[in-house]
Amino acid sequence: MSAEAYLWFKSLHIIGVIVWFAGLFYLVRLFIYHEESKNMDNVLKIAFNKQYTLMEKRLANIITTPGMILALSMAICMVIMQPSWLSEKWLQIKISFVLGLVIYHSYCYKIMYSLQNGTSTISAKKLRLINELPTLLLFIIVLLVIFKNNFPTSVATWSVVGLIIFMLASIQLYAKIRKKNENSLSNE
């Protein structure tokens, strides 16, 4: 195959990755809103449940999953063109993180079905934590692709640790501010 074909595969792979991640980021955000709508009065709860269910299904089935399929199929095409890359340590590590992302994607479907059926036991706070996982995976995967076998372990390790701490602190701070605002509104 030609170098041009490889560039097409690579371009479509990048587009698929962007679509996939955009879908995952928004999907879990919808789950958070869906979960929070359970606290509304019955009429609103029913209306929001129907709307969030529809939005989640469309996002998952029309955007997120096709993005994943495009990203993975183009990655397979690139590896078929360059099979020697499979011996590269950075690619082996990247593949393991991508498999983690596929598992995360599948877990999102489980959450989606449980929200639709009214059997979800995951709090909005836990969903906010879950929502940060693809950010971490994206961070690691991009660093692996850019640096390849020269991956800056010490810098990357501390960056990931710092990012995790920052995200956890941000989630906690957001929850406190939100709760404080809700309490002040209910006291008025």
Predicted segment positions?
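Polytopic transmembrane helical bundles with strong interfacial aromatic enrichment
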Residues: 1-188
